[in-house]
Amino acid sequence: MKALHFGAGNIGRGFIGKLLAESDAEVTFADANTQLVDQLNHSQEYHVRVVGDNQHTDVIRHIAAVQANSDDVINQIIKADIITTAVGPQVLAKIAATIARGLQLRFEQGNYAPVNIIACENMVRGTSQLKQAVLAELPAQYHAQLEEYVGFVDSAVDRIVPPAAANDEDPLAVTVESFSEWIVDKNQFRGDIPPVQGMELTDNLIAYVERKLFTLNTGHIVTAYLGKLAGYKTIREAIADEEIQQAVRQAMQQSGEVLVKRYGFDRQLHHAYIEKILTRFANPYLVDEIDRVGRQPLRKLGAEDRLTKPLLGTLEYGLPNDALLKGIAAALHYRNADDPQAVELQGWIEQDGVEAALLRATGLKADEPCVATIVAEYQRMA
């Protein structure tokens, strides 16, 4: 099985690339970082330190790498059995032209073996969005072949992989938590489903996408924004604060009630899942910076993302949401001079006021009662 993975960063190496390699795939990473590509090709292996209850180090061998915008990556697309990505939502659309070019040449060369593409991003239906971007780049005469031979498989992914600390002795090493979850929509594959260890199949993906978004992502971001206000630097420090931990637990429980209503998740099992996530945030072996988790607040306040989307669910079902409102108020306070979105958000607030900035970022309507509550909470936090 030939696998091409876009994004040789920490998630690519420590999660998706690792699972592919451990499933005996020939893994080639594609990345824009020339130094990283050269290092991978020179060593042809890297170390993954798995931390938690059962610590160990895995050696991932027999890997290669290519430049993301080179002829080499096109050749890999022509030959691949599976193509995966972990490049971030902002970059995903930018690789569509490369994928389209590779698929066009694949068809022109007569390779009609099925190939499946899986975007492993913090997005709802990210692969479906990638498909539309690829179709926009691919000449129309190849669209029917794409529909028949190329599977665009949506997924939900969950593993905390903080940025690696600088390590001159082993620059490719990455540290990950022991927990991981990769769930894919089994109905979207073309041909045989690739035998990838750790890749779980479901026919109800959206429930698991929202479970992850409303729980891990919601909890993570509320921890980050409340932690930032309290002066903490890492997620572990913030979640050790009893007041913050309780607010984060309540936010996840409130978003969880939406999941129980919408998808029929078992409330008791979901509460256990929440407690597991709180334990993961407190992992003493993971140094996860608050500014890594909190960055890009405009995206994270968006109507389809981890704060506003669960809030809209509570409004839909008439459920409590005070902890979620507190998280959104804390997001409006987020300041980070190195993050363009944080700077832009604070500019909106200074220019137009907090309510106008809130409405612009979230898409909420001014007459929603929760808007006044968020603004009041924001003022209380000031």
Curated annotation (Swiss-Prot):
Binding locations of NAD(+): 3-14
UniProt keyword Oxidoreductase, yes or no: yes
Native organism: Tolumonas auensis (strain DSM 9187 / NBRC 110442 / TA 4)
Stored PANTHER family: ALTRONATE OXIDOREDUCTASE-RELATED (PTHR30524:SF0), MANNITOL-1-PHOSPHATE 5-DEHYDROGENASE (PTHR30524)
Listed GO biological process terms: mannitol catabolic process
Keywords for this protein: NAD, Oxidoreductase
Protein name according to UniProt: Mannitol-1-phosphate 5-dehydrogenase
Gene: mtlD
InterPro entries assigned: 6-PGluconate_DH-like_C_sf (IPR008927), 6PGD_dom2 (IPR013328), Mannitol_1_phos_5_DH (IPR023028), Mannitol_DH (IPR000669), Mannitol_DH_C (IPR013118), Mannitol_DH_CS (IPR023027), Mannitol_DH_N (IPR013131), NAD(P)-bd_dom_sf (IPR036291)
Catalytic activity field: D-mannitol 1-phosphate + NAD(+) = beta-D-fructose 6-phosphate + NADH + H(+)
Transmembrane regions listed in the UniProt entry: none
Top EC group: oxidoreductase
Signal peptide stretch: none
One of the Pfam families matching this protein, by short name: Mannitol_dh
